[in-house]
Regions:
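A short, conserved alpha-helix within the catalytic core of class I
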Residues: 165-178
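Conserved beta-strand signature within the Rossmann-like core of class I S-adenosyl-L-methionine
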Residues: 178-194
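A conserved beta-strand element that flanks and buttresses the S-adenosyl-L-methionine
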Residues: 157-158
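Short amphipathic alpha-helix with an adjacent loop that forms part of the alpha/beta core around
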Residues: 143-152
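Short, glycine-/aromatic-enriched active-site segment of Class I SAM-dependent methyltransferases
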Residues: 198-213
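Rossmann-like AdoMet
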Residues: 1-91, 95-138, 151-152
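Short alpha-helix
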Residues: 213-240
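Conserved catalytic loop of SAM-dependent methyltransferase domains
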Residues: 233-258
Length: 280
């Protein structure tokens, strides 16, 4: 029995990025593999013909490479933290149908997937929680969810493609709250500068009827811009297209490597890592 997805629903907004991760796995098999996305797409009753057609253009294929690199980079940071904190909480903020937590599972960590209640309802159908895993319905800006995370063994939080839709003040409040609640933990997320965020916003701001793009979270120099938020923050960043992988693979053209460099250097596409020091 396939899981039917209707057009113009919350479910549809979840399966488009899922489909993108499947396409990434096909286009760049040496660089990225999301078995869960491939498997879930098979279980879904939905007309993917338009998404399939749209996925094969030049810039769409580069967009797929962006998705692949972002997921790989965040997973690298999660695994790196687990090396020194094997019993940590691995927390996916704004998880959608992403299975990065599972792909990083070391057999002893605790996995938490957080998103809005209507999203978690779909996730529970398609990706029910496994061992040491919990799907938590919440609004990330309402910090009641803090109490549901067992961070006794440390915690690594990650957000993929999430904070572009947050106001700068919302990200700041969340980071400050996390510094209070989770000393010794780490938050990693992707970010970009104002120019890039304006380009991202073009698609969704029209429907959201939001005028002031400038209020939305964007970063050029993460260390100098975010460190003043709180004295306990240790902020580092690296380019998310080429900062973790040189992309010297037969599936990636020289033109795409050039675009990747433009993204990292001119758009400041980056993975930001925020370490939370001890309590004040």
């Amino acid at each position: 029995m396939k899981y039917k997805i209707e057009k113009n629903t919350v479910q549809e907004t979840l399966i488009i990025p899922l489909f993108a991760r499947k396409v990434c796995s096909e286009l760049y098999p040496n660089l990225y593999r999301d078995e869960t996305a491939v498997r879930l797409i098979e279980k879904i009753d939905y007309d993917f013909s338009e998404a399939e057609k749209n996925s094969r253009g030049l810039m769409q294929r580069f967009g797929s490479l962006e998705v692949a690199m972002r997921q790989n980079d965040l997973a690298w940071e999660v695994r790196d933290y687990l090396k020194t904190h094997p019993n940590a909480a691995v927390v996916n903020l704004g998880c959608g149908l992403d299975s990065t937590g599972r792909s990083c599972d070391n057999g002893s960590c605790k996995i938490y997937n957080l998103d809005f209640p209507d999203v978690i309802a779909v996730r529970n159908e398609l990706l029910p929680a496994g061992d040491r895993e919990e799907n938590i319905p919440c609004d990330l800006n309402n910090t009641e969810w803090f109490s549901k995370i067992d961070a006794s063994g440390g915690a690594v939080f990650f957000a993929s493609g999430v904070f572009y839709y947050f106001l700068t003040e919302q990200v700041k409040a969340l980071v400050q709250g996390m510094a209070d609640a989770f000393p010794g933990s780490v938050l990693v997320f992707d970010a970009a500068n104002r120019t890039a965020v304006k380009m991202i916003a073009k698609t969704w701001l029209k429907s959201a009827k939001i005028k002031d793009v400038g209020a939305y979270f964007a970063v050029s120099d993460a260390k100098s811009e975010l460190s003043p938020w709180d004295s306990r923050l240790q902020v580092t960043s690296r380019g998310y297209m080429l900062g973790y992988n040189d992309l010297r693979d037969s599936s990636v053209s020289g033109f795409f490597r050039f675009l990747a460099k433009v993204g990292d250097d001119m758009m400041k596409m980056q993975i930001v890592k925020v370490g939370f020091g001890g309590r004040k």
